[in-house]
Amino acid sequence: MAAALRFDNIGKVFPGVRALDGISFDVQAGQVHGLMGENGAGKSTLLKILGGEYQPDSGSVLVDGRAMRFPSAAASIAAGVAVIHQELQYVPDLTVAENLLLGRLPSALGWVRKRDAQRFVRERLAAMGVDLDAQAKLRRLSIAQRQMVEICKALLRNARVIALDEPTSSLSHRETEVLFKLVDDLRRDGRALIYISHRMDEIYRLCDACTIFRDGRQVASHASLANVPRETLVRQMVGREISDIYHYAPRALGDVRLSARALEGDALRAGASFDVRAGEIVGFFGLVGAGRSELMRVIYGAQRRTGGALTLDGEPLDIRSTRDAIRRGIVLCPEDRKEEGIVAHASVAENINISCRRHGLRAGLFLDRKREAETADRFIKLLKIKTPNRRQKIRFLSGGNQQKAILARWLAEPDLKVVILDEPTRGIDVGAKHEIYGVIYELAKRGCAIVMVSSELPEVLGVSDRIVVMSEGRIAGELARGEANEEAVLNLALPQGATAHAA
């Protein structure tokens, strides 16, 4: 019997880059096939070929033994293929029900029957075990909830081949377990699934087989992961040994740089109080909905502050906008880097130099293009940003390389005092994480106060000097590095009702 999906010698070339070179592997019906590799290795490019966004320059895609060409996303969908990318595709001002049934809403005489649509979607969501309000607009949902809408959309299409690109990157533990159950159900139902993830636990938990990409090539394939050590997968992914991904080293800390007292905002239930010293890395952990990102956006001036006080180096700090924050040396690398972190239509060099244009990189009234080019080239080399050249549009880079460019922007900033990192390694491979941690330590050595929000508990424990735990919109506790472990952090992160019930 023919494989449900086969890639046969797939090749793809972009200007100056061979993105894919001779990719060949099968995915059987009733199988979950993992794809692993560093950012920029070619995994997402392959899925874009499968989804009809790109056309291969060589090779072919076979579905149930038949060679297929997908000139558009619609052609891919019509062939029974669903691809869920990291960059979510939705209409923000439509409801959950309308997004899920987009293009096939039930109608009568040209009028959409919204009541029927909402009832149908509620029934399907309940059957999947997904807790979403069918009438809620996508704009009002969290990133995690929007991710679940995308996954549900593929399931409602009854696709035979489903590809998931980092599907749990924004999901809570409970939502991740719901997804895992859905994947297990789909496998039992005979669907063929491709699963891209940088999280080893997920690959070993879900995948029957695994293929490793590096620099656009297929470097290894494993028909089973039962006897494959994790160290082998890491070595195959990055081409080198990484003994300690965090490479933490203590630093000399300065005086208190940023201080928050009884800070309140629309999504913060109780006043938040904490300090961060110069050169210190303070990790913020909490479950989805704990209020971490909201607190950071209040500090940065992106959300309204309703109470409390901030000081910077002992002086009162009145921030009314993000521009105020940047002027005072406070910057934020946002969770949603594609929407809020990068200027997608601009080049890598322009994205790196955005902050520097306020000072230094001018020759009279004109931008000093030569110095901008030198600055961009220096950080591209320093941070190992994978790009054909500085003029490449940043939207064509992988997520990890986009994140490095955002960090380069602030490394180039001479007056930096506080760096807020919201999920800095979300959707990024182990090799790129290793390099980004190095950038974070470098900023701390410069005397910056670092605030790092992360949903990855090993990352928080591995990188932070101190850990602040949030739960239900308030700070639930604080742990020094020496006393922090997974159990202690999770006990603080669980809602009080859940903790009491467990007891």
Curated annotation (Swiss-Prot):
* Cellular component, GO annotation: plasma membrane
GO MF annotation list: ABC-type L-arabinose transporter activity; ATP binding; ATP hydrolysis activity
Its membrane topology is listed as: Peripheral membrane protein
Start and end of every ABC transporter domain? 5-240, 253-497
Cell compartment(s), UniProt: Cell inner membrane
Annotated catalysed reactions:
L-arabinose(out) + ATP + H2O = L-arabinose(in) + ADP + phosphate + H(+)
| EC class of the enzyme, as a word | translocase
Short name of one Pfam family:
ABC_tran
Name the Gene3D superfamilies on file: P-loop containing nucleotide triphosphate hydrolases
Q: What is its main location?
A: membrane
EC id: 7.5.2.12
Q: Where does ATP bind?
A: 37-44
Name the CDD domains for this protein: ABC_Carb_Monos_I, ABC_Carb_Monos_II
Reading the lineage from the top rank, the first entry is Bacteria
Q: How does it assemble?
A: The complex is composed of two ATP-binding proteins (AraG), two transmembrane proteins (AraH) and a solute-binding protein (AraF).
* Similarity comment text for this entry: Belongs to the ABC transporter superfamily. Arabinose importer (TC 3.A.1.2.2) family.
Q: What is the protein's known function?
A: Part of the ABC transporter complex AraFGH involved in arabinose import. Responsible for energy coupling to the transport system.
The name under which this protein is listed is: Arabinose import ATP-binding protein AraG
Supply the source organism for this entry.
Burkholderia pseudomallei (strain K96243)
